[in-house]
Amino acid sequence: MVIGYTTGVYDLFHIGHLTLLKNAKGLCDKLIVGVTVDELVLYKGKQAMIPYSDRAEIVRSIKYVDAVVPQYDMDKIAACKKLGATVLFVGDDWYGTEKWKKYEEEFAKEGIKIIYFPYTKGISSTKITEALKTTRGWSNDHSLMNKKKDNESNHLNA
């Protein structure tokens, strides 16, 4: 059985995410998806619009996904080994970079193949976020995570 693994924030889930998951599932028997936890998103200098628990539930509901695990760090080799994955699916924007050439060698030593998928042209969570900021006048702190925290505070104060 071929176990595949891929990771992502999966914020503002869009057709590019769906295409990646569909294509990945077509190349493995079991697809495990690591959804990046909120703390790691912040560590990488960004903020998710949708909280981790909601993003994980959205990804879990996709028919191509067999399991969802939290991605707490960037160590994909350790994750693949722990999960028994022999294939890692990543976006082709990393293809050919020095960093990923080294990763390919390291993964190969562990018997893990890296398969690159093309990004869906013209769509990304970042582009959607920017469009929302422009068209709706949203600021950087306009996220459902903040709304959820505000609602929780309001319920506690009621």
What are the roles of these predicted feature ranges?
Residues M1-A158:
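Nucleotidyltransferase catalytic core that binds NTPs
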